[in-house]
Amino acid sequence: MPRRTAIYPGSFDPLTNGHLAIIQRGLKVFDRLIVAVANNPQKSPLFTAEERKALISEAVGNDPRVEVDSFNALLVDYVRTKGVYTVIRGLRAVSDFEYEFQLANMNRKLLPEFEAVFVMTGEDYFFVSAQLVREVATFGGDVTGLVPPNVAQELRRKLGTPAHR
C-alpha cells in the first residue's frame, strides 16, 4: 500500500496548539505530513522561517512522520515540486470555511490535481489564532495553554516579557 502524504501549509507565526491539533488529526488520516512554513514577503513575521521550522520540529517531538519545510512560492508550485497534491487546511469557524473554500477552488483552477482536506481544530482551540497569540504575548499576556511550551518560552525571550505563574 502506498504511503499517503499530505502538506499542511501555513505561516505558523507562531505555532499554536490549534496547529498542533491539526497535525495530530492529520496523522490519523495520513501516514506522513509535510508541515510547510510559508514565507510571505508582504508580511513581517515575528519569527524567521528557520525559527518557525525549529519550533515546529521541537513541538512535534521530531516525529519521523512529520517533515518540516518552508517555501517561497505559490502553494500550487510548492505542491507540484513536492509531488504531493493533497493539502490539509484547518478550520476554526464557518468564516474560515468561506475563505478556505475560495482558496481551494483557486488552487484547483491553477492545478487540477490539487485536493484540499478540511480538518476541524476542535472545541478547545477554535478561538485561537496566531495573530491573537502574538497580540496577547506582545502586551505581556499569558499564552500558556494556547501554544506549546517551547513556543511560549521563545515568545517571552523574543518579546522580553516575563514568565507567568
UniProtKB/Swiss-Prot annotation:
**Which Enzyme Commission number(s) are on file for it?**
2.7.7.3
Specify the protein name: Phosphopantetheine adenylyltransferase
Give the family, as the similarity comment puts it.
Answer: Belongs to the bacterial CoaD family.
Q: Provide the top EC class.
A: transferase
Give residues annotated as binding ATP. Answer: S11, F12, H19, G90, L91, R92, E100, Y125, F126, F127, V128, S129, A130, Q131
Record: residues binding substrate: S11, K43, L75, R89
Location comes to:
Cytoplasm
Q: What is the lineage of its organism?
A: Bacteria, Pseudomonadati, Myxococcota, Myxococcia, Myxococcales
